[in-house]
Design a protein with these regions (language model features):
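Short, surface-exposed patches at the edges or C-terminal ends of soluble domains, predominantly
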Residues: 1-261
Length: 261
């Protein structure tokens, strides 16, 4: 009779290569379906990590910085001002500070590092300027009514003036540094530390703003803010407008083409 055709011998499946265990040659759709849970979890973790990093406030160790929580920082003052409804932010350059304009207070630390022209631009800006720290500084170009002085005091100081902000503060726990004032130029001094030497002073600026000087920058730091009337004076001297721009001239880079008028 006719013999049955010989059956072709098929290659045996490799041991352990069951369904789903063979990757080579697996359709891309199947791979994606298998990887989908892993991809979803990875994406979720990335989102959580990003959100966490964004929610964590950044801090610095720069003296007098509004994001410095240490004793030499001013983060507490910045928070108090925000609690009063102010919008508080930092300026990165002298040109940005000078562009603030009316309706803004610009707090300036290390003002002596600016040029005469940069200080003059601040004076003409129309903004209120509050100088934080007068010791070893230079006011040329800013005002002719005040001159930084080295006279200091360690005892409690009383206002001895009619300025509303100084009267509200009531007292300062001394002052490292001071300013002399020229009353004929419209300047007035408070909290005297000696003859014609004051821990706080004010004057009118040519641009229409008001100049206020807190001679001792340490008075507004986290470590000293709770003493005497420091907080009251700082909040009032910086809180006359809803916008506060904090500018530390020591943290500003050298003038670039973007900073030139």
């Amino acid at each position: 009779g006719v013999s049955a055709p010989a059956q072709e011998e098929r290659p045996s499946r490799p041991e352990g290569a069951g369904t789903g265990s063979q990757v080579v040659g697996e359709p891309i759709g199947a791979r994606l379906r298998r990887w989908r849970p892993f991809l979803i979890v990875t994406a979720a973790l990335a989102v959580v990590a990003l959100a966490t990093s964004l929610m964590q406030p950044t801090t610095s160790k720069i003296p007098y910085a509004i994001d410095n929580p240490k004793g030499n920082g001013t983060q507490a003052l910045a928070q108090l001002l925000r609690d009063e409804g102010l919008r508080v932010r930092s300026a990165d350059s002298a040109s940005e500070a000078a562009a603030a304009g009316p309706g803004t207070t610009v707090a300036v630390v290390n003002i002596g590092l600016l040029t005469d022209d940069q200080r003059a631009a601040l004076a003409r800006s129309g903004a209120d300027i509050t100088v934080v720290g007068a010791l070893y500084q230079n006011f040329d170009g800013l005002t002719a009514g005040m001159v930084p002085q080295g006279a200091s005091a360690t005892g409690v100081l009383a206002p001895h003036c009619r300025d509303d902000d100084a009267v509200a503060a009531e007292a300062l726990a001394g002052s490292r540094g001071s300013v002399s004032v020229d009353e004929d130029a419209g300047a007035a001094g408070c909290f005297p530390v000696g003859e014609d030497r004051f821990a706080y002073a004010t004057a009118r600026l040519p641009g229409g703003g008001r100049l206020r000087v807190i001679a001792d920058a340490d008075l507004v730091t986290n470590g000293a803010l709770a003493r005497s009337g420091h907080a009251a004076l700082a909040i009032r001297a910086l809180g006359h407008h809803e916008q506060l721009l904090w500018f530390d001239a020591s943290q500003s880079g050298p003038p670039s083409v973007w900073d030139t008028p």
